[in-house]
């Protein structure tokens, strides 16, 4: 027997009655705030390109503060930052800046206390300060009051001295701000000997540090800080390749510590490679192959292949299959998306990336939701996705594989003359999925059809996702209407995501229905948005 419900009954506790007595998915100001923190917009559309943030983008945030919920807002900012829910970092930093200069004292204090937790690296701190400057424009009062000076001082003083030395030498400046600016403007009083040394180094330079500490007896911890700062200075002044390699190896210096001329040396790259994080390794494979650092059949290639296929390392680095797929397709092409760099792909590395891609599926945590993916199989899906080197058809195939391998109860269908089941199995390889999809006769991408088909076939789904290029047709029934009809008939509070991967902009999601989302383009941030939306976190 079919489950039927009418809109005068709630589908779950999150629905509320409207003025006509029908139950709807209300988008509360807290929901709008969460969307903003995740992807920089309070509406139902995620754009992959950067948008300039202003107070007009954060009206719900301002209303929540006015309603006396500012401390809850700050807690939400901390949660999104600490749990890695944000697809982009800027919105959380902007929201914190807004909270830090609102008129509500408690919100302000909570925001400043949160600065060390939300601004985890110097780049975040510089961005936060710049947002505060932007928000102060046109206002007569200055921004460097006691509260900001204390928050910035605390940011530095709560750090371990050696870790701070690493941070200030790696991330020197951003957005027009430097550590020297912040230390001067915050009137910092360093909390211990090691931090005093780092502050002197930033403010006065290495010669002053040498002079001040040459005859002082130092604690073992402060001695380490001195030696580390000396290493970062020596590496900038020497042309001796062996000395540079020794300094990299002994003090674990990174690429940012080196001069551009140093990066022309194969041996220096080999030294950097030893401790290079996996994400940086994926980014630099082309460069290192082009410069013969990764020469065919070399020990470096063997080491890279071993690391790429090590499940423990993949898990520790939280590498998503999509990140590996982008690296694989970029590397195979022998050139980047932009720039003049060219290389001949090493077959062993291609094979290792391919293995890593399939291994990484095991590391994705299932959501436990029932998915129905509807795929556009038209020839135009061979176009490049906005923000990626991948074609739309490859992204759609990879997402089908991801859902098939991680979610137990899932269905794949294709837009043909009618909705057709897409025969994708757990053990299929990527090229096999792409071939299966291309074998299906294409039809119009009517975004209402997946819900109408699921309703007709009595298919239970919590999440509908449409993957298309930029064809987002609305024909006899609007997708929002089809989704509401599906919810009503099946008694399931289903959600719809329309992902138009080559589109600059479209509008299908009802902005007042928190169960609908549009995605323009596709990038790694879109994965965070989809997951958060699926788990009801935004």
UniProtKB/Swiss-Prot annotation:
Could you give a single Gene Ontology term from the biological process aspect? Answer: cell projection organization
Primary residence: cytoplasm
- Which residues of the sequence carry a binding annotation for a divalent metal cation? 378, 380, 445
Q: Output the Gene Ontology cellular-component terms.
A: cytoplasm; ribonucleoprotein complex
Q: Which domain of life is it from?
A: Eukaryota
List the PROSITE patterns hit by this protein, alphabetically: TROVE
Where does the record place it?
Answer: Cytoplasm
Location of the region described as RNA-binding in the Swiss-Prot/TrEMBL record = 120-284
Its biological purpose: RNA-binding protein that binds to misfolded non-coding RNAs, pre-5S rRNA, and several small cytoplasmic RNA molecules known as Y RNAs. May play roles in cilia formation and/or maintenance.
Q: What is known of its domains?
A: The horseshoe-shaped TROVE domain is built with 7 helical HEAT-like repeats, and is closed by the VWFA-like domain giving rise to a ring-shaped monomer. Single-stranded RNA is bound in the positively charged central cavity.
Q: What is this protein called?
A: RNA-binding protein RO60
Gene field: ro60
